[in-house]
Amino acid sequence: EAGEECDCGAPENPCCDAATCKLRPGAQCAEGLCCDQCRFKGAGKICRRARGDNPDDRCTGQSADCPRNRFY
C-alpha cells in the first residue's frame, strides 16, 4: 500500500517494522528472491534456474526482485 516499504506482518520479522511497515534500520529489503537476511544478494547470484537453453536469471545487486532475462 501507499507509504509502505514492506508488508506488515509478524512483529518478529527482522527486516520490517510491523508497527510502521517500514524497513528496519540497516535493512535493504524484507522479501524477494534477491533478498537474503535483509540485504540484497550480490550481483550475479542465481535467483531462478533456467529452463531449456535460456540462461539463469541473476540478481542485480540493486534490488530484491529477480529480473527475468531477456531471452524468454
From Swiss-Prot:
Keywords per UniProt: Cell adhesion impairing toxin, Disulfide bond, Hemostasis impairing toxin, Platelet aggregation inhibiting toxin, Secreted, Toxin
Q: Which PROSITE patterns match?
A: DISINTEGRIN_1, DISINTEGRIN_2
Transcription: present as a keyword of the record?
A: no
Per the record's keyword annotation, is Disulfide bond included, yes or no?
yes
Q: Which family does it belong to?
A: Belongs to the venom metalloproteinase (M12B) family. P-II subfamily. P-IIa sub-subfamily.
More about this protein: The name colombistatin has been given to this protein due to its source species B.colombiensis, which is a synonym of B.atrox. The disintegrin belongs to the medium disintegrin subfamily.
The identity of this protein, by name, is Disintegrin batroxostatin
